[in-house]
Regions:
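Alpha-helical, largely C-terminal catalytic domains
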Residues: 135
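Conserved GNAT acetyl-CoA-binding A-motif
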Residues: 141-151
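Glycine-rich acyl-CoA binding loop
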Residues: 128
């Protein structure tokens, strides 16, 4: 069972969001976070973001070592319907997690957000809302989608709660 929230098309340009192109994959940033195209170079830092409670309710097993994380990253990057990002805190300049667009269907003008995880250090901070704002703005203003959905497994109570907090 999935929780799905649909947002209407709105322009969010007054938030001063900067979009920079890098190999046809965007780097998105605001005052709190920078979203960089996910790469195997992020593997070691991302492993440090994983813990058992964080991954509870996810549909895939946790990538608990660098080799498994690199496999996870390669899998995310190999799917043309996904656009995965490493999340970098602009406060600490450290990688604090990952988030993704997926199931992008340009012909239907729809996209989903998910496959998100963050270091426990940033739970409840401005990181998640900042990431979602950047992704929503990019989806509506650059990808020109009409429908955006957040999807999480119903067993993933932490993610469902974080989505509800977005409003």
């Amino acid at each position: 069972m999935y929780l799905i929230l649909i947002l209407r098309h709105t322009s969010i340009q007054h938030f001063n969001i900067k979009v920079v192109s890098m190999n046809h994959t965007p780097v998105l940033e605001n005052q709190f976070v920078r979203l960089e195209p996910l790469d195997i170079k992020h593997g070691e830092a991302l492993v440090k973001c994983i813990d058992a409670e964080l991954w509870r309710g996810m549909v895939t097993p946790p990538p608990l070592n660098v080799d498994l994380m690199i496999e996870y990253i390669i899998g995310m990057k190999s799917d043309s319907a996904k656009m995965p990002f490493a999340v970098v805190s602009r406060v600490t300049n450290e990688i604090v997690g990952s988030t993704s667009f997926y199931d992008y269907a340009p012909a239907q003008k729809r996209i989903e957000l998910g496959s998100t995880f963050y270091s426990r250090d940033v739970w409840g901070s401005a990181v998640n809302p900042s990431c979602k704002l950047l992704l929503c703005s990019y989806a509506f203003d650059q990808l020109d989608v009409n429908r955006l959905a957040f999807r999480c497994d119903s067993r993933n109570e932490r993610s469902a709660g974080a989505i509800k907090k977005l409003g």
